[in-house]
């Protein structure tokens, strides 16, 4: 982050007060389109289409845009002329796209610098890669086994543009930047009413910035969750992009609420609270009673409706009892499972059998929703019976095989932490048989005849890749005993949800 701070050329006091002049500096555009900062779009190409301006960027275009920004009237273009009005060879929409990227980057760096300073003096938990989605589950396994209720909250989106502008006012004191931000935001809403190509939409970085600033303001309300907490934060610069938040055990904050929030002190009798937020949802785990959990629920509803002026239905907050209900989180179904243990104790000539029960977090694959996603993509029918992928029959055999193998390995990689591998093997079976049926359909043959001609070597492609990786991680004796197939493995290189999870 130190290297980004040099680009701003401001000290801490001026940094939040004078952001508008940065729109007229060429080196900021270089930073915005730098390979490192633009990594997000390439990594998430499966979700967002690359827009044209990434390929057309040049210093000449930047100079033309800055020249146009000095003349304010030239930025205001009627919406009907948005794609027809050209300025130095580019449409007005193209320049608005560049401005949206620049605005997001400038404010992101400013936010991140202040966010980093807010962690000073805090106790940071060590983690090899806290950006990984799988790093959440070991945390939940260690902590949720001690709790009985979880509050599952779907974070609402603001329905009015002024709410976003108002949220940004708390953090950006530069009036010129706020007016410019409001202008670009309203211009974009005018474009949505007209026929504009999907790839011409504003940069996803801009919308991620809007969403994260909204969530950041919401989480700042719960300062008591951060007053005396330990943080596990991301290790890279993309701290504002869907940042994983971990708040550990909260203690010694009752005095704060006696002074500031005496009316809701009854909600906070239990000082042990865990909060996790990722991908538009958050969970709050406590040891509270059902009555107090309902109070938490309506507190969330009133918070959004009264403080943030967002219509928020109570159905968006669900109370899950972990011993009875399944918690659907990040593509897994999690619940508490009682694991009985019998321990024999020998004392002199007498022996005793001691029954012990260990509570364990059980994470399973939601097989019905995964099969529904596979059926929607035409890999199988709604009952889970594999069918041929007709749209891929025009590709080469190697291309078809590589596609299926890649999908199978990605699913195995993401759901390697499942406690029941039977459902995972069923999904892999569907993909393997779908691959064979697709190849047989291409060659106008039956599945039996096609497999007889090629042998079993075709299906081994689905197994070798994952087995080779696991054989390097675990010792040979452990791998040979086949106990590996019953062990849950959490990988620390998974940064995004699997496509089948995102399908809904």
Swiss-Prot record:
Disulfide bonds: none annotated. Its main location: plastid. It is found in: Plastid, Chloroplast. One of its GO terms (cellular component) is chloroplast. InterPro entries: Domain_X (IPR024937), Maturase_MatK (IPR002866), Maturase_MatK_N (IPR024942). Transmembrane segments: none annotated. Keywords: Chloroplast, mRNA processing, Plastid, RNA-binding, tRNA processing. It comes from the Eukaryota. GO terms for biological process: mRNA processing; RNA splicing; tRNA processing. Pfam families: Intron_maturas2 (PF01348), MatK_N (PF01824). One of its GO terms (molecular function) is RNA binding. The keyword Endoplasmic reticulum does not apply. Belongs to the intron maturase 2 family. MatK subfamily. Usually encoded in the trnK tRNA gene intron. Probably assists in splicing its own and other chloroplast group II introns. This is Maturase K. It comes from Barbarea verna. The gene is matK.
């Amino acid at each position: 982050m130190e290297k980004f701070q040099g680009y701003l050329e401001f000290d801490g006091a001026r940094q939040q007060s004078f952001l508008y002049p940065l729109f007229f500096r060429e080196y900021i555009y270089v930073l915005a389109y730098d390979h490192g900062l633009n990594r997000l779009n390439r990594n998430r190409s499966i979700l967002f289409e690359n827009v044209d301006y990434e390929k057309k960027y040049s210093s000449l275009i930047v100079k033309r845009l800055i020249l146009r920004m000095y003349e304010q009237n030239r930025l205001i273009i009627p919406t009907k002329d948005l794609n027809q009005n050209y300025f130095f060879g580019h449409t007005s929409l193209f320049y608005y796209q560049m401005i949206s990227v620049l605005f997001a980057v400038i404010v992101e760096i400013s936010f991140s610098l202040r966010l980093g300073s807010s962690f000073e003096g805090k106790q940071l938990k060590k983690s090899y890669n806290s950006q990984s989605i799988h790093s959440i589950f070991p945390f939940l396994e260690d902590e949720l086994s001690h709790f009985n209720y979880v509050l599952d909250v779907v974070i609402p989106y603001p329905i009015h543009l002024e709410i976003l502008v108002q949220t940004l006012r708390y953090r950006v004191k530069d009036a010129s930047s706020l007016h410019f931000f409001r202008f670009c935001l309203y211009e974009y809403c005018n474009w949505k009413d007209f026929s504009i190509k999907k790839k011409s939409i504003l940069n996803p970085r801009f919308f991620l910035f809007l969403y994260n600033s909204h969530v950041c303001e919401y989480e700042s309300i719960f300062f008591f969750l951060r007053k005396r907490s330990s943080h596990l934060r991301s290790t890279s610069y993309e701290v504002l992009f869907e940042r994983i938040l971990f708040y550990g055990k909260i203690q010694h904050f009752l005095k704060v609420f006696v002074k500031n929030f005496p009316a809701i002190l009854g909600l906070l009798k239990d000082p042990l609270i865990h909060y996790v937020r990722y991908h538009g949802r958050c969970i709050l785990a406590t040891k509270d009673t059902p009555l107090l959990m309902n109070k938490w629920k309506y507190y969330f509803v009133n918070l959004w409706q009264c403080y943030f002026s967002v219509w928020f239905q109570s159905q968006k907050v669900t109370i899950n009892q972990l011993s009875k209900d399944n918690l659907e989180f990040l593509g897994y179904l999690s619940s508490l499972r009682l694991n009985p243990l019998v321990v024999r104790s020998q004392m002199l000539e007498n022996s005793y059998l001691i029954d012990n029960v260990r509570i364990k977090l059980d994470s399973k694959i939601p097989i019905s929703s995964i099969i529904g996603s596979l059926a929607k993509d035409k890999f199988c029918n709604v009952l889970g019976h594999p069918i041929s992928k007709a749209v891929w029959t025009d590709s080469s055999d190697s291309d078809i095989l590589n596609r299926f193998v890649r999908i199978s390995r990605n699913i195995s990689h993401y759901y390697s932490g499942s406690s029941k591998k039977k459902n995972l093997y069923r999904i892999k079976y569907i993909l393997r048989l779908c691959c064979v049926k697709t190849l047989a359909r291409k060659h106008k043959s039956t599945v039996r005849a096609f497999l007889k001609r090629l042998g079993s070597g075709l299906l081994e492609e689905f197994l070798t890749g994952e087995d080779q990786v696991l054989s390097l991680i675990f010792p040979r004796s452990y791998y040979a005993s086949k106990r590996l197939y019953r062990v849950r493995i959490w990988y620390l290189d998974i940064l995004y949800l699997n496509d089948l999870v995102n399908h809904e």
